Design a protein with these regions (language model features):
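Histidine/cysteine-enriched polar flanking segments
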Residues: 1-117
Length: 117
């Protein structure tokens, strides 16, 4: 899965396009081309005049589910459809991260491992 920005005037467009270009030329350890699943970026999410790093790729996979952040924007439904097509053996659950993203992270960030001290 790779994030893609369709709005050419968006500040992320160029970098994400370059990422896609690099990945498109990449192969796995067996010399096979990678299967690339494009995930559109959500429309910009702005809180208190600050654009926050909303991304659907901040998802979490568990044994039976996939928790996907959503942001109450037009792209949410399309992205959930893509996830459901890809993760056919897991329940895809949308989690509203509209407020959570203000902390500059979402589901995947919250579930990171804590090292034992």
């Amino acid at each position: 899965m790779i994030a893609v920005e369709n709005n050419r005037s968006d500040k992320n467009y160029k970098a994400l396009k370059e990422n896609l270009k690099i990945l498109s030329k990449s192969y796995d350890e067996n010399g096979k081309k990678l299967k690339i699943i494009k995930i559109p970026m959500p429309s910009p999410v702005v809180i208190d005049k600050t654009r926050v790093p909303a991304s659907y790729l901040n998802f979490f996979i568990s044994n039976k589910t996939v928790l996907v952040p959503v942001f109450n924007v037009k792209e949410d439904k399309k992205v959930l459809k893509i996830f459901r097509k890809f993760f056919t053996k897991r329940e895809v659950i949308a989690i509203d991260c509209s407020d959570l993203i203000w902390g500059f992270g979402a589901i995947h960030c919250m579930t990171q491992q804590e090292p034992k001290i």
